[in-house]
Amino acid sequence: MSLSAFTLFLALIGGTSGQYYDYDFPLSIYGQSSPNCAPECNCPESYPSAMYCDELKLKSVPMVPPGIKYLYLRNNQIDHIDEKAFENVTDLQWLILDHNLLENSKIKGRVFSKLKQLKKLHINHNNLTESVGPLPKSLEDLQLTHNKITKLGSFEGLVNLTFIHLQHNRLKEDAVSAAFKGLKSLEYLDLSFNQIARLPSGLPVSLLTLYLDNNKISNIPDEYFKRFNALQYLRLSHNELADSGIPGNSFNVSSLVELDLSYNKLKNIPTVNENLENYYLEVNQLEKFDIKSFCKILGPLSYSKIKHLRLDGNRISETSLPPDMYECLRVANEVTLN
C-alpha cells in the first residue's frame, strides 16, 4: 500500500467511530496529484476522490472539481462560504473545515443542504455562535466543537444523524432541550465542557453514549435515565453533584457499562446496576465503602460485574473495606485506592 493510500485509510478508520483524527502529513507525502484537482490542493492518484487543501492560508473555498467526495480544508483562514461553493460536487460525502475563521453570518444560504450525499461535516475550532443549517438528511456525523455556540437550531428530520460532537462551547440547558427531537438514530452525543446546569429534557432514547462532563450539573431528576434503555457510556465527571442531588436509583440502568462520576462532591457511593463494568469515583468526598451500592443480594449468581473501580482521591482506605467486598466484586480486575 502506498503512503498516500495509507493516509486516507487511517482517516477512514477514524471516521467509523464518529471521531476525526488529524494526521498532519505534509502535502508532498501524498505523491503525485491527480489532474482532476484544484491547482493549490492535492488529490492523490491512488485516491483521486479525495482533495487535501490543508495549511495553505486559504481565505475562501477553492474550486472543487466534479468527482471529489472527500474534501479537507483544515488549518486555513477561510472566513466565508458562498452558496455556490460546492455546486460542482453534489456527491461530496466528507467536508472537513476544522481550524478556520467561519462565522454563521458568512455561511450562505442552503450551501450544506444541497449536498445530498454528505455524511460527515466537521467545523471544529471556528467562530460559530450557533449550529449550522439546514443540513441534508444524509448526514451521519456532525462535529462543531471548540466554537462559541450558545444556540442550537432543530436537528429534526436528520434521520441518519448518529454522532454529534458539541463539546467546548457555551451551551446552556435551555438551548439543548428542544434541539434533538426526533433523532431516532442518534447514538453518540458529547455536550462536555459547556455551561449546562440541569440535565436537558428531550434527549433521544436511542443514545448509547452521553458525555456531560465538565458542566455545572448539581442534581439529577428522579428516574431521568430510566427511559434510556440502550445507554452504555455515561460521563458526569467534573460537575457539582452531591448526595442530596442524586435520587437512590438514578444509575440503576441495566444497559450501563461505564459510569464516570469522578471530581464531584459525593460522600456516599451511588447505587448502580450489577451489570456495570467500569465505575469511576476518584476525587470525591467518599468516606465509606457500602457493598449495597454494588450488590443488593450476595449469592452464587448474584454479584457485581465491576471490572474497574476507581476510588482514589477519597477518604476510603484499604483497611476500611468490608471483608466480603470481593465476594461482591468477584470479577474485578482493578480497584484503585489512595
Swiss-Prot record:
Main localization, broad class: secreted
UniProt entry keywords in alphabetical sequence: Disulfide bond, Extracellular matrix, Glycoprotein, Leucine-rich repeat, Phosphoprotein, Proteoglycan, Pyrrolidone carboxylic acid, Repeat, Secreted, Signal, Sulfation
Disulfide bonds: 295-328
Single GO MF annotation: collagen binding
Protein's name in the database: Lumican
Xref: InterPro entries: Leu-rich_rpt, Leu-rich_rpt_typical-subtyp, LRR_dom_sf, LRRNT, SLRP
Signal peptide (UniProt feature, chain positions): 1-18
Glycan-linked positions: 88, 127, 160, 252
Subcellular localization, as worded in the UniProt entry: Secreted, Extracellular space, Extracellular matrix
Domain LRRNT: 28-66
Pyrrolidone carboxylic acid modification, residue list: 19
SMART domains in the record: LRR_BAC (SM00364), LRR_SD22 (SM00365), LRR_TYP (SM00369), LRRNT (SM00013)
Organism: Homo sapiens
Family membership: Belongs to the small leucine-rich proteoglycan (SLRP) family. SLRP class II subfamily.
Residues found modified as Phosphoserine: 304
